[in-house]
């Protein structure tokens, strides 16, 4: 087993199983223009799903949809800013009118942010942006898409989360982890209601992925992680097996340790905070 497999959630390369699970089904993927969302869209289209691509970047979405369709897939692009309440409501209405109750929703759109507290004194918008994209945005969309799914008594929601909401929060990640944690708690809270109506909810707690969001942080380049195409296999596993959660094996003991040994955990975080620095982009963005 390679190191990247050991520190990330289990993934599957069972193409036949994925095809059986999604062929002829309609799957919506947010954040589909880059990174994991794009990789998931490609994987699902190749497996026979009708893929609805959602992101803010219209040109990227349209190009991806055209490529998938030219390769024999079936894809539709829906450019939208989910932080806009009106746009999110209109998107949900349009998708429901055109496609009916969805079979799978992959909540992947997100905004990462790593910045020290002293650089955020005059950047309250950092928190507004992360909350808007990572918490309120997906709720806005789901509130519009869930009614027909619950009425149909079927469907699956897959939330792409982070191990950071399951273990002791790391320094400089406050805005990001708080927003991801907020959605995680909300989704776990409504899951019993959704399951009562026949829906399945799966959360994939991802460790490090090599994407545009992680690229600016130097230490992320040397830690073991997954490329988007590899991480897409975790989503494929979630669709095929429909578990409640997917997480690296070490998340549970790390969570227990942080609770049972708060002193050593806090000491480690202080060492980590001193050993790491803000990126140039974060530092420049924090100076006003």
Description of each model-found segment:
Residues 59, 79-90:
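The beta1-alpha1 cofactor-binding region of Rossmann-like NAD(H)/NADP(H)-dependent oxidoreductases
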Residues 49-64:
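Conserved glycine-rich Rossmann-like NAD(P)H-binding loop of the short-chain dehydrogenase/reductase
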Residues 162:
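Residue(s) in the substrate-gating loop at a strand-loop-helix junction
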Residues 112-128, 172:
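Conserved mid-core segment of classical short-chain dehydrogenase/reductases
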Residues 142, 179:
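Active-site helix of classical SDR
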Residues 203, 220-259:
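C-terminal helical subdomain
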Residues 26, 31-34:
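Conserved glycine-rich cofactor-binding loop
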């Amino acid at each position: 087993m390679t190191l990247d497999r050991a520190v990330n959630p289990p993934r599957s390369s069972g193409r036949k199983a994925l095809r059986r699970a999604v062929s002829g089904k309609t799957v919506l993927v947010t954040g589909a223009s880059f990174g994991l969302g794009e990789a998931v869209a490609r994987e699902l289209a190749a497996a026979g799903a009708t893929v609805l691509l959602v992101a803010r970047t219209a040109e990227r979405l349209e190009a991806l949809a055209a490529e998938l369709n030219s390769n024999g897939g079936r894809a539709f692009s829906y450019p939208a800013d989910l932080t806009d309440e009106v746009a999110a409501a209109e998107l949900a209405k349009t998708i429901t009118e055109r496609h009916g109750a969805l079979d799978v929703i992959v909540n992947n759109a997100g905004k990462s942010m790593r910045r020290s507290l002293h650089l955020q004194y005059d950047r309250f918008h950092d928190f507004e942006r992360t909350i808007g994209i990572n918490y309120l945005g997906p709720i806005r969309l789901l509130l519009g898409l869930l009614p027909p799914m619950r009425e149909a008594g079927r469907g699956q929601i897959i939330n792409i989360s982070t191990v950071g909401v399951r273990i002791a929060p790391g320094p400089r990640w406050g805005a990001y982890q708080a927003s991801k944690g907020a959605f995680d708690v909300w989704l776990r809270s409504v899951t019993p209601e959704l399951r009562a109506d026949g829906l399945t909810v799966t959360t994939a707690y991802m460790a490090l992925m090599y994407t545009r969001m992680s690229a600016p942080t130097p230490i992320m380049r040397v830690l073991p992680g997954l490329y988007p195409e590899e991480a897409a296999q975790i989503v494929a596993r979630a669709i095929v097996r429909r578990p409640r959660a997917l997480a690296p094996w070490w998340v549970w003991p790390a969570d227990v340790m942080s609770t049972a040994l708060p002193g050593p955990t806090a000491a480690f975080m202080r060492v980590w905070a001193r050993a790491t620095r803000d990126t140039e982009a974060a530092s420049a963005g924090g100076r006003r």
